[in-house]
Each structure stands twice: as structure tokens, then as C-alpha cells.
Amino acid sequence: CGGSSSSTAPTEVVQLRWFVGLGTGTDVETQVPVQQEVVDAWNAANPNIQVTLEVVPNADAKNTLLTQNAAGNPPDVVGPAGVAGSNGFYGQWLDLAPLISDANYDLSQFPAAAVEAFAVGGQGQLGLPFASFPSFMYFRPSLFEEAGLNLPPTTYGDQYEMPDGMMVDWSWDTIREIGMLLTVDSAGKDATEAGFNPKKIVQYGYAQPWNGAPEWASWFTPGQFLQSDGKTIAAPDGWVDAWQWYNDAAFKDYFMPNADTSALEEWGQGNAFPTGKIAMGQSYTWYTCCLGDVLGEDWNIAPTPSNNGTISNDLNADTFRISAGSKHPKEAFEFMTYLLGEASAKLLVIYGGMPARAADQDAFFATLDEKFPQGVNWDIAKASYANATTPSAEAYIPNYLKARDYIYSDFTPKLTKAALNVSDYVTNTFLPALQAIADEAE
């Protein structure tokens, strides 16, 4: 007898790869096991779409992904990664707009501005909101109290009361003034007093935790180096003045540690705020990862200062992307929306990102309150996110990886290495060098 003519062909199992390493997600103790749980749950519920988790150490991830893409073997889903992590692969991400339309995926669950942040001109909708990292001012209340200063404002738009009772805007000019009052030498003199010794400082009013020149300037005025013609590199309006503010803070007004001081062990080797000897520092929500044990519960957050009456809230945002060369884009989108949806609660906890959905934010901050029980004013973080500015400090530049390395490894350190006429240096050295790097991409 012959076989049955009515046999049904087996359904093909689609194999997907999820590549982790361009951003967070590589910690083998706290992150990889949870990501594997997320994959296992998906695989159990979706026998016809099986996912393999591929975790590559951050230091190797860029080269690994470049090699895979060049060999025609790209992973399907990549992330979490921020703007900087993904810009090194410009033109290699899939436009999600057709998939969003075909799946009738509901974009109204996200703020419109958050969706637009992942829409790249000429490239399409390259991602959807997931983990957000708004920026604001970290501060140590006890140092304000010891100096007899009022604490920073608790709401955007509120003014600050100076020691003489004058009400002033919470601005970068104000940060300079109170930063000097909060900077103290070994004799107890602050940086405004006669006889203050800048070589014997025991407490600084301000320190800039990590980040680099684009972020530093973006907190004064949003902008990007690449101009509208897609070729010309220029410093956005206000950025040179912002960089001069930081240089003066270190070498003229002395309320911020310079590069040499910051590198010392007693000043945190590049992360000074957690030493407990720094009054203020501007950063993002992800910085809660790295506050150490010395501060204890003696820290809180305040609004981003204004500049010329305008507040610029730079936003870091991580999400997932689909490789343009994925052989299974429809299935990859299904898995990606699972990461953005059902699996997001687990993932956001291990990534430290604020949920893009407003409905999920209170639960997220409740978990942070368990870790930091002093009553952090998380309404500041929510307001910073709701009023985030664009373009991102991590905006695209041609030859991005080389350009970024030059900006962060060469230019940024110079801003706090020695007293500098920033305008001259930017005009005569920095911008020509950055333009030459961008031109190499042609």
C-alpha cells in the first residue's frame, strides 16, 4: 500500500537570533539569566518561532555585529541599544513602518514625541519607545544645609532663593554661583572668599559624572554637529559657550574638579559624586546604578537648570531594532513587540530604564523606592521625560564610530585638562578634525 495522499506538510519553524551587547544586557549575573527566562517563555508559547539569545561582551559587540552584517548573516533583533550604539550601523536597520501598519500595532500607548524620537530622516521608523533615561540634577542635601543654602527647587519652573533672599531662575548661572559657595578648601573658605586655596579643595560644588562634550552642551541648548545638508559639521549655537562654562568651572571658578583631580582615587577616578564630597552633578536615570555606598540616603534630584530662560532636557533612550537583512522581518517584529510589551516589566528592572508607557512608570519608581527609600522626587524624572528635547546629544555623524571616539576620547578630556580658549580650539582644531573624519565616510 502507498502512503496517504492527504498528509499535511509540517509547519516550518522560524529561527530568530536576538543579539545583545551594543548597550546594557551583558551582565552574566543579573541580566543574562533574566533575558534567557524571557526567551524561554517566548519559545514555550511560540513553537513555530524559536529565538536564540546571543550575548556578546560590550567591548566586542560592535566588531562582531559589523562582521556578521558584512557576511550576510545579521541577527534578527538587536538591543537594547541607545542612539549611540545604533548609529554605528547607520543604514543597516529595518524601517518598521510597514510592519507597524500590517500588524495594526497601537502606537497610542506611547507619547507621540517618544515615537518620533526613533523616526530617522531618510531611514524611517527604526525603533519604538522602550527604556527611557531622562536627565536632571543629582544633589546632596546635607552639603547645602551645611553651607546654609536653600535646597534646589522641587518643581520645574520654580525659582531658587539665594542666601540674600533674592529669587533667581534655577539656571546654569545659578549653578555657578551656588557651586562656588559649596566649594570649600581645607581652611573652610569657600570659592568666593578671599584667601581661598584652589590647590587644597576638600569639597566641590559640582562635578560632571561621565558623559561627554555633546551631553554637557545639550543641557544648555539642544543641537547636533551634522548640519541640514548632511555633510557640514558645525558647533550648534550656544555649545561653545557651554563648553567654556565647564572649562571655567575647573580652572577659573574652581567649583568643579579638573581632569587630573577627577582621576585620583580619593575623587572617584572619574565618578566623583559618590565620594560624598560633591554637592551637585547632572546626569540621567541610569546613573542610579553607580551611586555607591558612601552617599547612603543623602541624595535627591532637582530640575535641569535653564539657560537663557530655556530648559534643555536631553534624553537617553534604549530600544530594540530589526536588522535590515533579517530573513524573517514579520516574525522578528512579533518577537520585538513581545519584548516591548509582555516581557518589558522584567527587562526594564534589569536595564534600569524608565518605562516609556506612562501607565507603567509608577510601578517602576516603586521598585526604585525600595532600593532608595529616602523619598527621591521622581516627579522630576517624569517631567524631564515629558519635556525631553531633540535632537539627541548622540545624534548621527557620518563615520559615526570614529567621530564619537574622537569627541569622547580626545576633545572631551581637553575641556577639563587645562585652561582653554574654547572658541579658538573648537574653530581651529576640533571642528576641522571632526569634519575630516566625517568626510572619510564619503
Task: Walk through the language-model features, giving the residues of each.
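Short helix-initiation/N-cap motifs at beta->coil->alpha
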Residues: 55-64, 168-174, 258-274
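Conserved C-terminal helix/tail region of periplasmic/extracytoplasmic solute-binding proteins
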Residues: 366-374, 385-442
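Glycine-centered hinge/linker elements that transmit conformational signals in sensory
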Residues: 176-180, 214-218, 228-263, 304
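Extracytoplasmic/periplasmic substrate-recognition and gating elements
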Residues: 50, 123, 143, 147, ...
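Hinge/lid segment of periplasmic solute-binding proteins
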Residues: 57, 81-136, 145, 195-199, ...
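Extracytoplasmic/periplasmic solute-binding protein
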Residues: 121-131, 135, 163-232
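Conserved N-terminal structural module of periplasmic/extracytoplasmic solute-binding proteins
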Residues: 1-90, 101-108, 147, 151-152, ...
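Short, solvent-exposed loop/beta-turn-alpha elements that line the ligand-binding surface or hinge
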Residues: 97-110, 153-167, 196-204, 223-242, ...
